[in-house]
Each structure stands twice: as C-alpha cells, then as structure tokens.
C-alpha cells in the first residue's frame, strides 16, 4: 500500500504560524482516521524536548507529535540548531550533539551532513509508520533568494517528497496580500505547482469584510485560499523567545504575580506554560536592567549560556535585587540553568561556556557548586518530591544539561532521587524540565505562596498539564476544521 501524499506547511515569514497550523493539521488528520507524521527537517530553537530514547528535538515538533497521537521522536526533527550567541549554534543531528557551527561557514561545513540526517530521519519515520502521512513544516520564508541554493528544509524537501504545500501568511503583521503574492512570484517555475492552497492566519474582525480580498487572491494568483484562521494566540505561546515581550496582557482575576527573568540566552521557556495557564497567576517577564519589583515569587528559567546570563544579571544589578528579594523572605525557583545560577560557585574547567578554567560566583542563594563538563544529561525522569509539602508527590519531566551540581553544605533535597533538586527556606532549584507540568506539585507550590498572602488554597488534585494541552489541541483543531477546506490538499486526483 502506497502511503498518502505528504503535506507541507510553508510560511511567508518566520512567525507566520506554521508550527501551530502543522499541529492543527496533524490533529485533524488523526480525527479522520489517518496517522499523521510531523516532520521538520531543520529547526533553530532553544526550546527543546528529550524523547524516550534520550534524543534531543525541538519542542514544537514534540507538540505536533502529541497532536498526531504519537510519542515525540527525535527523527521528527533530525537537525536542530541551538543558538549560543555570537553567530554560533550547537548542532544536533538525530537527537545527538555533533558539534558547533558558525553562521558564516554553516552551509559549507554542515549542508551535506544535514541533508543526510534529514533523509535518515525520514527513513526512520517511514519504517516505523509505513502507512502514515508525512506532515512537514517549513522554516522561515521559502523564498530567501540568497539562500535558496542551500535550502535544507523548505522547497528542497517539498520537491524531494513531491509534497502538496499550504502557504500561510500572518494578517496581523499587515501587508498580507504582498506577503502571499510576493512569495508566489519568487518561487521558481518548478516549485510553484507544489503550492496547492493559501491560508490567512490570525484574522481579527468581520469575515465578510475580508471576503473580497480572499476572492482577489484566488483570482490573481490562481491558487485557492483554503481558509481564514481566527486569532488564537491565547491557546499556545509563540515558539521563539523573541516574541515573549508580545505575550498576553494582564489577567482580570490574577491573585499572584510571578516574575520570570528573561535571560539573554533563555531556553526551554515552555517550562512556564503551566503557570501561564493558571487563571490566578500573572507572569511578568523581567529583563536585565528592568526593576524586579515585589512579586510573589521569582522564577529563573533555563539558559543555553549559564555563565554569560549570570554575568548579565550581575552587571545589570538584577542579581543584587534578586538577592535582596530572597533575603526578605521572597520565594525563588530555579530550573536547570536557573538552578545552577542560584548556587555559590560555577566552574568551567574545559571551557564549555567560555575560556577553559573559568569560574564565576553564583547568586549564593543555595550552597551549591556546579562543574561544567562531561557528556550532556539527556533523559526522561520520574521522581518523588518531598517539597513544598512533606508528603510524597510523584513528578515527571526530563533532564537536559551539561555539568553536575553538588551541595557544599547539608541541604534539603527537593526529590527522593539524588541530584534532581535542592531547597533552603523559600529558595528551590531543580534540574527537572517540566516540573511545573505536574499539576499536584504546581498547586502545592502555588498554595505555599497563597498562604503567605492569606488567600484561599487552590484544589491540589490537578492532573498533568498534558491533559490541558490535549484540550487546547482539540480547540485548535476545531477552529481549523471550521475555517479551512482541506479538500485540495488531501484529495487524490
């Protein structure tokens, strides 16, 4: 039996909504009895996930795999570039770190190995799911004319697989007609027939007022507009950290304010999604140089460059503000790189984050020492937490870090399992990404904050955040089915 024709979601630009439209398409196809196989040949992101085998992949492909009813598999994202700063990225092939690349030499040195990794990922998925339909996501714009000859993940892949493409444009940015018409005009003659439909994303207003524009696009491009998706940004956060400052406004019923430090090399900010989803919690992102204020708690999230981000906090004065906040009894939670910064000392003997033999004083909110080195810890974990309450609380998540941390003084462990986290007073840190997805643990931590404000406690019998994520994916798919006609994409001639 021949597998169904692959589909591909292209965008007129970065941030057009490709990732969520791909997730929506996966969930809709799953509802229709197909087995969608999400795939993005190359992604650039520090928002990562670790699959069951310990392979590293972009979080957006993990989200798409859940939409497809599958466990995340690093074969779905065979090339991941993790920016380090200074035009340098860590290169992940097939879930494993294979080196560092500089922007100016990336395609000379990494193009052929990248294309090989992409084909190997495709082959692995097809072997595992021979009757599944590939649902591909492009990257950025497919018509960057100076880069087309070095394209790894847009139209090169679409041509290789003879995929039917859906071109998405974000009307919220303005200029949607120029976005779509310009992109189509810049396609090469062999590429344009691959585009079977157009999609307008993030529309706000009365649809009937835009209908003449829809007709104009179809008539003047010869490509049908398959749908107009409404504004749905309240469902999921944007994928890229550059969009964080454009996040939602204040919640009407928020009772707790939690400040999150927006580190220059911020990573895995999806760890904060469960807090963002709490109706009573207002997140406030604070950049170095901005005032910390008097929040109810502070979260230090993950970092791709822990020493560099720590230096930025110290140089801006935000580190001193955080130390004063903690000395006054303020609650602080550090995750992964944030945990490392909370410690007393950070050592880098092999120069993984800078000059060999470098060391730095931490925030000294926990008596910990972190030594960078050795192989990267990449594994899913199940553990039992004994804080913020003494009762046992099962939790799960994943580790994704280099280096090891030890306590320099007797210190309360956050978990029964050694080395996953430590606590002293109101300051806690953990290596466990996904910690806040554990509903019962999250509510225990929030109730600790609420008691300090004499607020009534929240129910703690909360399921894992994945249950809420499933509801959001269904709402996304509902909107997609209601507003998009897939017939030209999925119907065989």
From Swiss-Prot:
Pathway connected to this protein: Cofactor biosynthesis; adenosylcobalamin biosynthesis
HAMAP family to which the protein is assigned, alphabetical: CobQ
Cross-referenced InterPro entries: Class_I_gatase-like (IPR029062), CobQ/CobB/MinD/ParA_Nub-bd_dom (IPR002586), CobQ_GATase1 (IPR033949), CobQ_synth (IPR004459), GATase_3 (IPR011698), P-loop_NTPase (IPR027417)
SUPFAM superfamilies to which the protein is assigned, alphabetical: Class I glutamine amidotransferase-like, P-loop containing nucleoside triphosphate hydrolases
One example GO MF annotation: ABC-type vitamin B12 transporter activity
Species for this entry: Synechococcus sp. (strain RCC307)
Top-level division of the source organism's lineage: Bacteria
Keyword Repeat: no
Stretches assigned to the GATase cobBQ-type domain: 255-441
Protein's UniProt keywords contain Lipid metabolism: no
Gene3D superfamilies reported for this sequence: 3.40.50.880, P-loop containing nucleotide triphosphate hydrolases
Name this protein carries in UniProt: Cobyric acid synthase
Active site, UniProt feature: 336 (nucleophile), 433
Gene Ontology biological process: cobalamin biosynthetic process
Record's function text: Catalyzes amidations at positions B, D, E, and G on adenosylcobyrinic A,C-diamide. NH(2) groups are provided by glutamine, and one molecule of ATP is hydrogenolyzed for each amidation.
Keywords for this protein: Cobalamin biosynthesis, Glutamine amidotransferase
């Amino acid at each position: 039996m021949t597998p169904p024709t692959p589909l591909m979601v292209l965008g007129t630009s970065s941030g057009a909504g490709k990732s969520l439209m791909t997730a929506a398409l996966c969930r809709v196809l799953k509802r229709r009895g197909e087995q969608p196989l999400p795939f993005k040949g190359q992604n650039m992101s520090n928002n990562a996930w670790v699959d069951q085998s310990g392979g590293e992949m972009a979080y957006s492909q993990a989200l798409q795999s859940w939409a497809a009813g599958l466990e995340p598999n690093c074969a779905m994202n065979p090339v991941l570039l993790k920016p380090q700063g200074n035009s340098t990225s860590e290169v992940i092939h097939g879930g494993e770190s294979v080196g560092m690349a500089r922007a100016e030499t990336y395609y000379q040195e990494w193009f052929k190995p990248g294309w090989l990794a992409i084909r190997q990922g495709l082959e692995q998925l097809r072997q595992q799911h021979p009757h599944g339909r590939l649902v591909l996501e492009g990257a950025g714009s497919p018509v960057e004319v100076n880069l087309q000859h070095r394209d790894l993940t847009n139209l090169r892949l679409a041509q290789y697989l003879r995929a039917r493409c859906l071109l998405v444009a974000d009307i919220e940015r303005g200029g949607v007609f120029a976005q779509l018409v310009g992109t189509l005009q810049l396609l090469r003659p062999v590429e344009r027939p691959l585009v079977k439909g157009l999609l307008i994303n993030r529309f706000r207003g009365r649809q009937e007022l835009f209908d003449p524009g829809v007709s104009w696009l179809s008539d003047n491009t010869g490509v049908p507009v398959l749908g107009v998706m409404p504004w749905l940004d309240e469902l999921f956060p944007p994928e890229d950290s550059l969009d964080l400052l454009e996040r939602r406004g204040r919640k009407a019923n928020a009772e707790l304010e939690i400040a999150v430090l927006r580190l220059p090399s911020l990573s895995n900010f999806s760890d904060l999604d469960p807090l963002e989803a709490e109706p009573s919690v207002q997140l406030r992102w604070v950049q170095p140089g901005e005032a910390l204020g008097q929040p109810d708690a502070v979260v230090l999230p993950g970092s791709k460059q822990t020493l560099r981000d720590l230096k930025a906090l110290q140089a801006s004065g935000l580190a001193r503000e955080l130390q004063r906040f903690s000395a006054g009894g303020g609650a602080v939670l550090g995750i992964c790189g944030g945990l490392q910064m909370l410690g007393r000392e950070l050592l880098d003997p092999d120069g993984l984050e800078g000059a060999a033999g470098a060391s730095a004083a931490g925030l000294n909110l926990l008596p910990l020492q972190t030594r960078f080195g050795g192989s990267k810890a990449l594994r899913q974990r199940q553990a039992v937490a004994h804080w913020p309450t003494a009762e046992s609380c099962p939790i799960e998540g994943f580790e994704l870090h280099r280096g090891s941390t030890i306590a320099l003084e007797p210190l309360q462990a956050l978990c029964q399992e050694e080395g996953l986290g430590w606590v002293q007073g109101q300051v806690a840190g953990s290596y466990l990404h996904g910690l806040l997805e554990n509903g019962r643990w999250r509510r225990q931590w929030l109730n600790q904050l609420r008691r300090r404000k004499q607020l009534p406690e929240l129910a703690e019998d909360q399921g894992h955040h994945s249950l809420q994520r499933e509801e959001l994916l269904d709402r996304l798919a509902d909107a997609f089915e209601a507003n998009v006609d897939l017939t030209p994409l999925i119907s065989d001639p």
